[in-house]
Design a protein with these regions (language model features):
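Aromatic- and glycine-rich peptidoglycan recognition patches
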Residues: 1-27, 33, 89-103, 115-158
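N-terminal capping segments
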Residues: 1-77, 81-86, 117, 133-135
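Structural motif
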Residues: 109-110
Length: 158
């Protein structure tokens, strides 16, 4: 244990940093959990979530597809799956956490969760010093952002 951070949390941060170093190999795609993106995989994932993807035009779809092809595609919980070695969705992760707390009280390696006021769901990993790592939207990969102001509703330890 480093200070009051459990060893598994230290390991989660180390794994997240490793993934971040290789972030160009990853692409965000809603519903993806670590598949290698081929045309078939892309179309299957796109077809599985018509209500989510209807916001994109045909031209935007083509741009997103070109960005994803050949990469490993993940969404936010897919990123956490790679970090933890578990397989869950964002809500299941936060519901399985101990030490549920407010985002300002999370510790390094804890999860952060939001529903964006009921408009969706998102999960990320507190990596310390006021930052978190996540995979959050199309045409992007694994990224690091500031915790404050993101709209996190709660956090917890897995």
């Amino acid at each position: 244990m480093i200070y009051d951070i459990p060893d598994k949390n230290v390991a989660y941060i180390a794994k997240a940093r490793e993934l971040y170093k290789n972030r160009d190999k990853y692409a965000y795609l809603y519903g993806a959990k670590g598949q290698k993106c081929t045309s078939e995989v892309f179309e299957a994932l796109w077809s599985a979530e018509p209500n989510y993807f209807k916001k994109y035009s045909a031209a935007q779809k083509a741009q997103i597809k070109a960005f994803c092809l050949g990469k490993t595609v993940i969404d936010c919980s897919g990123f956490i799956n790679l970090v933890t070695g578990k397989f869950m969705y964002s809500t299941a992760y936060i519901n399985s956490c101990s030490n549920i707390t407010t985002p300002d009280k999370t510790k390094d390696g804890d999860l952060l969760y939001t529903t964006f006021g009921g408009k969706g769901r998102h999960i990320g990993l507190d990596i310390g010093h006021g930052f978190f790592m996540h995979c959050g939207k199309e045409l992007e990969t694994i990224s690091i952002d500031v915790i404050d102001g993101f709209g996190w509703e709660k956090g917890g330890r897995i």
